[in-house]
């Protein structure tokens, strides 16, 4: 019996399960036409756990131009904008929320609209509110989206055991609510040159998760790998090493071992178990310049599946740098002098 129990225990891993988006209702202090609060909780623009940037800002929430101060209720913090998420309906009991993931505003050339300094408060009934601190700070800082396509979550809040029906995000006033630094003349000059109004605020997506122990056999299997080899090298003690990214068709929760072979050289890597789920592995080829096309054999071994695949790695682009000599002769003042 002990052996059987141990075997069953070994087949279970911690996993964060997303609360269905149709159970989340969003509202905001204001919304720009075509950029509703609902767009930040309904999965629009999401591909799995990644958000796809959009030139026009589709699938994201954007406020109207906001320069004054507002608050959701007399019991919540004051700020420049607020964004409220209701979990379930008004008659449902508070839900357990063990993790919150936030994707900041991800519109190309407008990522500074993303929220920056934010107060996070929660409530079971919408009347009594409690502040969710970040350690000793009474606020969180949501990093600016870097505009990758697709983009992983910019901030993950671990909230073990939190029970709430309402979660309110209030962006601080005084120029700290988004990523337009009003004290940086370069930032403000860029905004003016691009005809950007720094008083807009936005978010791409917010998701809520509960933590549970899941049987590995119920997890989506990992059955496919894809490889992207960069054209860049990193400086390492052994010499320049080329970067690569390995992506998985489903998140890896149970951990995995990776074995590589390329050009007669072998190496290994390990992916630790993760309740969030790992969807990519960033690695380095062995030191040395890769000037010819090479074969890369990869073997992934996990309780979620075993995959073997051979990739053809194109040679890294070769660069030729030419230095041209340049001379200058001063021919003096060229304007005609008046007598």
Where are these regions (language model features)?
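Surface-exposed loop and turn segments in beta-propeller and other repeat-based domains
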Residues: 137-146
């Amino acid at each position: 019996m002990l052996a059987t129990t141990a075997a069953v225990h070994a087949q279970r891993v911690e996993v964060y399960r997303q609360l269905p988006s149709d159970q989340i209702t969003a509202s905001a202090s204001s919304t720009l036409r075509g950029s509703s609060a609902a767009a930040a909780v309904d999965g629009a623009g999401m591909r799995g756990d990644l958000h796809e940037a959009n030139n026009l800002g589709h699938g994201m929430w954007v406020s109207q131009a906001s320069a004054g101060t507002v608050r959701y209720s007399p019991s919540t913090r004051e700020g420049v904008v607020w964004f409220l998420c209701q979990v379930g309906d008004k008659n449902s009991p508070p839900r357990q929320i063990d993790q919150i993931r936030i994707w900041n505003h991800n519109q190309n050339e407008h990522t500074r609209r993303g929220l920056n300094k934010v107060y996070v408060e929660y409530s079971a009934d919408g009347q009594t509110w409690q502040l969710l601190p970040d350690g000793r700070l009474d606020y969180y800082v949501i990093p600016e989206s870097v505009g990758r396509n697709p983009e992983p979550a910019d901030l993950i809040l671990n909230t073990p055991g939190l029970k709430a029906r309402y979660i309110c995000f209030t962006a601080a006033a005084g120029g700290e609510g988004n990523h337009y630094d009003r004290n940086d003349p370069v930032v403000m000059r860029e905004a003016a040159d691009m005809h950007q109004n720094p008083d807009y605020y936005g978010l791409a997506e917010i998701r809520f998760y509960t933590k549970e122990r899941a049987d590995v056999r119920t997890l989506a299997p990992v059955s496919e790998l894809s490889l992207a080899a960069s054209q860049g090298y990193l400086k390492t003690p052994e010499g320049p090493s080329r970067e690569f990214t390995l992506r998985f068709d489903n998140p890896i929760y149970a951990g995995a071992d990776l074995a590589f072979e390329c050009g007669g050289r072998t190496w290994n890597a390990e992916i630790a178990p993760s309740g969030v789920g790992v969807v990519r592995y960033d690695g380095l080829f062995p030191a040395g310049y890769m000037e010819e096309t090479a074969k890369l054999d990869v073997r992934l071994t996990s309780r979620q599946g075993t995959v073997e695949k051979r990739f053809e790695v194109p040679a890294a682009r070769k660069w030729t740098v030419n230095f041209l000599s340049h001379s200058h002769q001063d021919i003096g003042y060229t304007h005609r002098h008046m007598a």
